[in-house]
Amino acid sequence: MTSIGWDAFAGCSGLTSVTIPNSVTSIGDYAFDGCSGLTSVTIGNSVKSIGDYAFRRCSALTSVTIPNSVTSIGGRAFELCSGLTSVTIGSGVTSIGTEAFSDCRKILDVYCYAEKVPYTESGVFICLPIENATLHVPDASIDRYKVTAPWRSFGKIVALTEDETGIDELKGENGKVKTALYDLSGRRVQKGQKGVFIQNGKVMVR
């Protein structure tokens, strides 16, 4: 499986955890829209694009890490993720769509590793108290972020510290404890089979 399609898991309120493997390159529009019970999302380091409304209304998410492989974040991709307090944006992101993080009113920290300030469409951080949040960016780029909308509106803009060295990549099977996989009907599946599976009570796409 190389992509998660349009509306694939929309409205699955019982979904609590998602791991998107390194084989997936795109997350479609509305893919996880309205998954209100989703508390954990791990995005593999081959994903290049996150579609419009992809994670909208995932109100239980408290943090999200967008890996360095991603170049574009779609419009309203994380709109109304009311529990988000921390967002990490990888170094490869070049564009962020309209109102991508609108109404995420609890955001306190945004860590952006892009040395070139990403292009943003209108209202990326609209309807949240951005003046109370801190933007963490590469030291060499801090002056550019300070003069570019909407980034300049953050209450604090600081350099990433030495401890914030980068984004951990999703490890393959060699870095994981082996566990059994089951399909959505409860049948155990063979190693290497592609699809959407349940592993340790969590949904996994591969």
Task: Tell where the protein language model's regions lie, with residue ranges.
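Structural signature of tandem-repeat unit edges
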Residues: 1-3, 13-26, 36-49, 59-72, ...
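Residue-level detector of functionally pivotal "anchor" positions at catalytic/ligand-binding pockets or at interdomain
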Residues: 161-185
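A recurrent domain-boundary module in secreted/ectodomain proteins
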Residues: 147-165
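C-terminal tail/sorting-segment detector
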Residues: 196-206
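Consensus positions within tandem repeat domains that build extended binding/scaffold surfaces
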Residues: 5-10, 28-33, 51-56, 74-79, ...
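A structural signal for leucine-rich repeat
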Residues: 123-128, 152
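Generic structural signal for well-ordered beta-strand positions
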Residues: 189-190
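Short hydrophobic/aromatic-rich beta-strand motifs
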Residues: 133-136, 181, 197-198
